[in-house]
Amino acid sequence: MIQQSHAIGPRPGSVRGLLLSLVCLALCACTGLPEGVEPVQDFQPERYLGKWYEIARLDHSFERGLTRVTAEYSRRDDGGIRVLNRGYNAEKGEWDQAEGKAYFVRGDEEGYLKVSFFGPFYGAYVVFGLDRENYRYSFVSGPDRSYLWLLARTPTVDRAVIDRFVTVAGSLGYPTDELIFVDQESGP
């Protein structure tokens, strides 16, 4: 008679399953909405496509030192959105750019997307404020309150747009006193 031995501890499959669950949880957390921030409804993706200028942002290493920052959005063949971010790096004397892809999280009538610049890793892109009449400016958040942008169709905006952005973002708990206003004139 052959006796079966039983290993003590978790089965290898269960550890693998746990690790996979943790990775999935981490990835989902990056595409979640910051608490209390609601994406705009009745979003019109075709009107959002095109070039946007970064007017203000919170600081992040991937944009640090860049001027003349823009984001350009166009349709992908798979129905998603192609994202091309570009900025001038004066220290290097050259343009930096990153290309990514974005997909709507809950349907294209809501300004809530997930965007990736690196493989399977996505972050939230939440349009929570928008000039609905002309799509001239947009208030954008990432997965938490450390990501915040004011985008516009032109390199400058009226002071009233900036004031509204600061007021709305501040009321939602964003650290608006840390905003960087992007130089859209320096560089080549």
Give names to the regions the model predicted:
Residues 2, 29-188:
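A beta-rich soluble binding module of mature secreted/lumenal proteins
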Residues 17-28:
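Bacterial N-terminal signal peptides
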